[in-house]
Amino acid sequence: MYQSPRRLCSALLLRDAPGLRRTLVPGPRRTLAPPVLGSRPKSPQLQAAAASGAARSRPRTVSSMGNGTSRLYSALAKTVNSSAAAQHPEYLVSTDPEHLEPIDPKELLEECRAVLHTRPPRYQRDFVDLRTDCSSSHSPIRVMQWNILAQALGEGKDNFVQCPVEALKWEERKCLILEEILAYQPDILCLQEVDHYFDTFQPLLSRLGYQGTFFPKPWSPCLDVEHNNGPDGCALFFLQNRFKLISSTNIRLTAMTLKTNQVAIAQTLECKESGRQFCIAVTHLKARTGWERFRSAQGCDLLQNLQNITQGAKIPLIVCGDFNAEPTEEVYKHFASSSLNLNSAYKLLSPDGQSEPPYTTWKIRTSGECRHTLDYIWYSRHALSVTSALDLLTEEQIGPNRLPSFHYPSDHLSLVCDFSFNEEPHELF
């Protein structure tokens, strides 16, 4: 049966949140103030979301679920069944966008706010202006990198001992994830540990104007968890009104000639405004201490694949990922010294421009507290410039129980950068 986007959006929320069928009592208001540096064109849907976000600090009464509003709250629940991933073994790029009607982001934000009304406010993060010369004649490209924490792993395997079980409930956590995406309005979204692609992110983000690709791990650890939602993997989304897809490659990474359980997606996109092409890639390397050589081999394999896709660095490149590696590891050094001439964007936030942030993930497990820098956005330094980057949460904001929490939905912080093409992109060396 056909469902309007409005009903669809509410259905996705309510499928996992039957409590919302009751009248919601207004709780402490949560603040969403999208910190956008400068003016940048957005899709009409995301412009509406930004306008809604600016007004979020004003108190509002949350309506009951009867009558007209029931259509809204019927929406984050009835799309694809939870077992949808098993029904899509081919993991195709996307459904036909002509058969999808857009969602109003303001309505989506309102639904998320209603679900999250009892949670504390989300913290503001500001963009740091990194421009060193006059701005480009074209609109910057905003890229978001984020390991969103697979739901099955958060509930079943990752042992976040200081995180209340209630903070991990999917019906609320997915709204925090969506809220973060809507707040920063990325043109390109690179995600890891996605285990709700078909039933949440693909149907919703496609109606916000994104085209998506999902590539699961062949032997996802999520499948070992009871009541899982299918395998986790990498997902890549881009705004269709800004970019044209030229090519897409799913890469199963190898190490010592052996195929591994880690994957990557690499896509060549063309900017509709400027006509310039670039490659965007997302990956998630092997985790855990003791696997450093394995990660190094995976990184070398990924670099070789990207070398071929970019025609020997002729095409500018952006690589986003959870590398599960500190800057002292070999795989980091491989990327820093690659012939692709890559630089790590978040080094630019340091006083000398040479140091990575002190952490991108901070959690407490049964084995102890883990504070590491594992997530990166690499870019072709002679073809692209970073014009701004989103600052990280402070230790005080993260709090003593660390991540995830009622404030923040993942154990990894999102990284967001604005890129512009250098005026002479052919001079890569």
Swiss-Prot record:
Substrate binds at residues 193, 217-219, 261, 284-287, 322-324, 412. It is found in: Cytoplasm; Nucleus; Cytoplasm, Perinuclear region; Mitochondrion. It is an enzyme of class 3 (hydrolase). InterPro entries: CCR4/nocturin_mRNA_transcr, Deadenylase_nocturnin, Endo/exonu/phosph_ase_sf, Endo/exonuclease/phosphatase. Its EC number is 3.1.3.108. GO terms for molecular function: metal ion binding; mRNA binding; NADP phosphatase activity; NADPH phosphatase activity; poly(A)-specific ribonuclease activity. Disruption phenotype: Mice exhibit metabolic defects including a resistance to diet-induced obesity, decreased fat storage, changes in lipid-related gene expression profiles in the liver, and altered glucose and insulin sensitivities. Exhibit a delayed early embryo development and at 12 weeks of age show enhanced skeletal mass and increased osteoblastogenesis. Residues 21-68 are annotated as: Disordered. Its main location: cytoplasm. Induction: Immediate early gene (IEG) showing acute responses to several stimuli including serum shock, phorbol ester, lipopolysaccharide (LPS) and rosiglitazone, a PPARG agonist. Exhibits a high amplitude circadian rhythm with maximal levels in early evening. In constant darkness or constant light, the amplitude of the rhythm decreases. Expression is regulated by both light and food-entrained cues and by the CLOCK-BMAL1 heterodimer and PPARG. Up-regulated in cells undergoing adipogenesis. It catalyses: NADP(+) + H2O = phosphate + NAD(+); NADPH + H2O = phosphate + NADH. Residues 1-73 form a transit peptide. Mg(2+) binds at residue 193. One of its GO terms (biological process) is regulation of circadian rhythm. Residues 341-351 are annotated as: Interaction with PPARG. Highly expressed in the differentiated adipocyte (at protein level). Ubiquitous. Belongs to the CCR4/nocturin family. PANTHER family: CARBON CATABOLITE REPRESSOR PROTEIN 4, NOCTURNIN. Interacts with PPARG. Phosphatase which catalyzes the conversion of NADP(+) to NAD(+) and of NADPH to NADH. Shows a small preference for NADPH over NADP(+). Represses translation and promotes degradation of target mRNA molecules. Plays an important role in post-transcriptional regulation of metabolic genes under circadian control. Exerts a rhythmic post-transcriptional control of genes necessary for metabolic functions including nutrient absorption, glucose/insulin sensitivity, lipid metabolism, adipogenesis, inflammation and osteogenesis. This is Nocturnin. The gene is Noct.
